[in-house]
Amino acid sequence: MPDSLITKRALASSLKELMKTQPLTKISVGDICEKCGMNRKSFYYHFCDKYDLVNWIFDTEFSEIRNRPDHIANFEDICEYFYSDREFYRSALQITGQNSFRDYFRMQIHPVLEELVGNLFDSEEDTEFLVTFLADGMVSTLIRWLN
């Protein structure tokens, strides 16, 4: 395993541990680095900010589910995935605004939903509306369910 991946995983593990006891908004990059014995320079070499790290965790752990061809089964898998790490995602989904995980998740789920409903409408505008509606609904439902 490359050193870069080891470093990223150590930072991810530290963030997940910290998020068990405090919200993401209260955790600093310094806290994450202190927890795993790394310096801030190492953190910023790999990630722009703590929100980028949250997105990397999601991408890394979720890629297997996201890449399956059977999207209907994926919805159950998505729920199981979020539930298995609910403390982490409960906190991550509370953040709104720039670089938020909510927006990142919507962006990641968008192509899956687009493929799923792409043939229902003749109009691209109608398809886009439904995909956005479903993505927003998934985020809201996950937040409610995890809380």
Where are these regions (language model features)?
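Hydrophobic alpha-helical connector segments
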Residues: 66-91, 98
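Short, basic, alpha-helical segments at the C-terminal edge of helix-turn-helix-like DNA-binding modules
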Residues: 28-29, 58-69
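Basic, helix-initiating cap at the start of DNA-binding domains
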Residues: 1-22, 31
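DNA major-groove recognition helix of helix-turn-helix
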Residues: 11, 15, 47, 54-58
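Basic, amphipathic alpha-helical hairpins
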Residues: 17-24, 85, 119
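HTH DNA-binding helix-turn interface
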Residues: 19-24, 37-54
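Append "Primarily bacterial transcriptional regulators
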Residues: 11, 30-35, 43, 82
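Amphipathic alpha-helical packing segments from all-alpha helical-bundle domains
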Residues: 77-80, 97-140
